[in-house]
Amino acid sequence: MAKKIPVLHTENTHISIKEGDSFYRNTWRISPDAKPDVFVTNPFVGTKKISFYSESDSLSFIVKPNKKYDFIVLQKGKEPAYTQIDTYQKEKPTLMPKLILKSKKTDNKSQSDTLRFTLGKNSLIYLKGKVNNSDSLDFIFDTGAGISVVTQSLIEAKKVNVKLDGDQKNTGTDGVSMVKKSSGNVFEIGSLLWTNVPLLSIDYKGFPFDMVLGWVAFEDKVVELNYDTNHLIIHNSLPAVDKEYSKLDIKFINGIPYIKCKTIVNGIESEAWFDFDTGSDGTMAVGQKFAAQNALNNTLKVIGKSTSKGSSGKEFTQKYVLMPKVKVGDFELYQVPMSINDQDPEGVENHENIGNVILKRFNAIIDFKNNAVYLKPNKLFYSSFQ
């Protein structure tokens, strides 16, 4: 009798993987055409537990080196993706080992660490830190980044000791590009120490920062952003949340956190998932698809046009309009400048973005452990959008 192949059920295009102690949230894209779609483990000795998680199901294997293990991911109950775990030690691993975050405090009874940040005139969150024992560098905290980044000019000027050891596909707001990557780096920011940090090297010409600290630096943590005190507090578990906060669900799309927001024109509400992006110096942005579907192109007053460049280096044009009303959780904002893509970049499915010109108006508790964010208006709520 043939051995029954295990099956993982999902309704989505991506699933999560836990390899040993490393958890990769919504990282594995299901590929029914691959036959098989192969996941190669990192080298190990003895045995290792590999688990796959969908939104409603899970499947675990105890694996040994130099073996292959087959299973099926059944998408929407009808489309099978034949998948294989490959533990051969000389194969190139599919995923890099996850970074490790530790507190340098010797007595941390509070189970939290507090970092002081500076809010730039561009609305970005700046932290002072080091990479691989470098001199002090300017980091920005970017929840819209699924990996940390070093600016290419720092490496070229030999201001940081970062060894580039491969290539990786990078998806930015302007499209997809191949960039150099580095593994096994060390970050130090305040009382926090990260080891085994993967980095991308991106040519951020003209951008006022040295490093990008992606949200994955705090995976499985709770991050509290207080713009009244300029404190970024890292908790191991959710602190007490007062009733003034509005709770929103987080949905991870291609490894980036999104929240639902509403635009309101002439009493008509349009809702979509927006990239929760503290690394954006803008207000809100929507794609041409969203604009066309919700009749925004010829309805709103155009107040300007611009040409932008994202992390892939490609230029794209936008028009700026005044959105009469925007709803974020239980809170409403009025006459919000918003950009609309003239044409959506290729290779990027989700174009809606809420940047830190808006997000800075809310103190936030971001629960990366349970996929939720809590927002409360702060002293910046009524500040100008300019």
Please place each PLM-identified region on the residue numbering.
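Pepsin/retropepsin-fold aspartyl endopeptidases
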Residues: M1-Q386
